[in-house]
Amino acid sequence: MARGADGGDGASVWQHVFLLPEYLKDDSKKMKSGLVFVKLANPCSGEGTIYLFNMCLPQLFEIKVFKEKNHSWFINESVQSGGLLHFATPVDPLFLLLHYLIKADKESFQGKFQPLDQVVMDDMFPDCILLLKLPELEKLLQHVTEEKEVDKKKYYKYSKEKTLKWLGKKVNQTMAALKTNKVNVSARVQSTAFFSGGQVSSDKDEDYVRYAHGLISDYIPKQLSDDLSKYLKLPEPPASVRNPPSKKAKLSDEPVMAKEDYTKFNSKDFKTVKKNSKMTAAQKALAKVDKSGMKSIDSFFGTKHVKKK
């Protein structure tokens, strides 16, 4: 079970720690529901994923989790186990819209022009209609759709050709960012580990393209990722690269899934002691110490008691 601060009535309060852009703090004060968590279809897998939606701008954020074992947070007068750190970073909403455009093109309308509000519909994830409130939506759609206007109403149809061109630009932008920040992509393609910026000179353009393609592929369906690979004319990776070892970075690449049980990330109860474990010499010496008058660290985080007069 999740452990948290004692609420006074025996109930545990589970809390999460987030890092957010500074301006979101002001937006949350302007509207009571300025920041809301929404469940939307993941553009890569199609599964339900939790996103953060800023109702003021509006703006969409994805959530990543930094996790390490045996870490906890001190929050006010409570200790929060697990030590998870959540990051909310802006995500291009066109990736999520693309999910519905491709789906409509394959299943429902099969190449027909349709109004957007009939394309972005989802009984499983009804909050998807929030995507229609995003600013400059029509300008975004020009990158991935063909457009027609009838009686001052616009109709859209998915365009694979335009989409690949747009994704190609995304790959180039990602490559530029990697080079600017001197990320050693050759090493990351091989082992997904970070190396010093001094080693960047050994990187090849193909490695940058391949790594950038991998990053973009986290936001598109696999079939489209394969099509993008062909569009970029990427050769098949060598056998040693196809199954690289696990990433050393602690920032999870997996999205925060909807209705996820956060307790699975928690470390085991640190109060549990192995029955057959032997005491060290230091532990034996500590056991002999007179502890009368000493306070447990737990006493500093428990509920305050008011003395009766």
UniProtKB/Swiss-Prot annotation:
It is found in: Nucleus. It comes from the Eukaryota. The modification Phosphoserine is found at S296. It holds the Pfam family Ydr279_N. Keywords: Acetylation, Nucleus, Phosphoprotein. The modification N6-acetyllysine is found at K295. Its main location: nucleus. The modification N-acetylalanine is found at A2. GO terms for cellular component: nucleoplasm; ribonuclease H2 complex. GO terms for biological process: fibroblast proliferation; gene expression; in utero embryonic development; negative regulation of gene expression; positive regulation of fibroblast proliferation; regulation of DNA damage checkpoint; regulation of G2/M transition of mitotic cell cycle; ribonucleotide metabolic process. The RNase H2 complex is a heterotrimer composed of the catalytic subunit RNASEH2A and the non-catalytic subunits RNASEH2B and RNASEH2C. Non catalytic subunit of RNase H2, an endonuclease that specifically degrades the RNA of RNA:DNA hybrids. Participates in DNA replication, possibly by mediating the removal of lagging-strand Okazaki fragment RNA primers during DNA replication. Mediates the excision of single ribonucleotides from DNA:RNA duplexes. Belongs to the RNase H2 subunit B family. This is Ribonuclease H2 subunit B. It comes from Bos taurus.
